[in-house]
Structures are given as structure tokens and as C-alpha cells.
Amino acid sequence: MKRYIILFAVLILGTVKANAQTKLKLYGGKNHDQFLGCIDCSTEDLNSIWCNFGEYGSVHKVNSIWNELGKYGSDKSDYSPFNKKAKYPPPVLDQKGKSHGFMTINKSNPKRSWDSFVNQITEQRDEIVKDIPAYHDRVFHDFHN
């Protein structure tokens, strides 16, 4: 019996750990073929939307959702999660390619992501861009504690 309890505990912990390590990624463009960054990666990961020095976490880079003048960050672009009327908001995919819905500020979009953190990003963008890494650290600290 003790052996079964240990096996059960190992299975549960393994499942929790695997779920915690799921990497959610954004893809943009009409065909969703442009990588836009990792949503739940660290601020040190150059592929993270939270890394100021990377391609996807800078307010100045072309493929960053934080670039308010860019194709993927403008509130006027059909490819931006911050445009309520966007025709092609970026899908959120996990590392296995499973869809987690679309990152969009449009709460009426039936395909909007069901992930509360993804939706929080679209709703708190103005606060986030003031200090992207600090926002990440605050939110992920709360999430992990």
C-alpha cells in the first residue's frame, strides 16, 4: 500500500511540474507564421516577451507586441492583440502546438484565450510597458508564491 501512495505522489508531482513548465508562445501574421515570443518565459530568455533586450520584449523592436507603432503592438493593426477589431490576433500555443485561444483585448471574441494571465496582459498593457521586467517579476512572484 505504501508503494502505491508513493507512486501516486510521484505521478501527481510530475503532472504539476509538467504543467508548470508549459511554455506558451505567440504567433502573429495572417497565417500565424511569425513568432512573437514566449509568454511565460523568464526576463533573461531572449525569446521572452518580458526581456527588454530581446526581439520580443522591447518597445522598439518590429516583432514585439509592446511596440505601439508596430504591426503587432498597435491598437490599430489587424494583427495586434490590443486592437478590439483585429482580424488576425495572435494565437497562443503551447510547446506541443495546442491552441490556448487568441490573445486579444476583444472580450466578445469567442476564440479569445481562456488563460487569465494572457487576458491580463492585454488589459494591463499601459502599465506593463512602463517597466516590462518589473511587471513580470511582480506577477510571476505572486503566481509562484
Q: Where would I find each of the regions flagged by the language model?
A:
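Sec-dependent N-terminal signal peptides
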Residues: 4-13
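Repetitive, compositionally biased segments used for assembly/scaffolding
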Residues: 20-145
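Beta-strand-rich domain onsets/edges
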Residues: 16-18
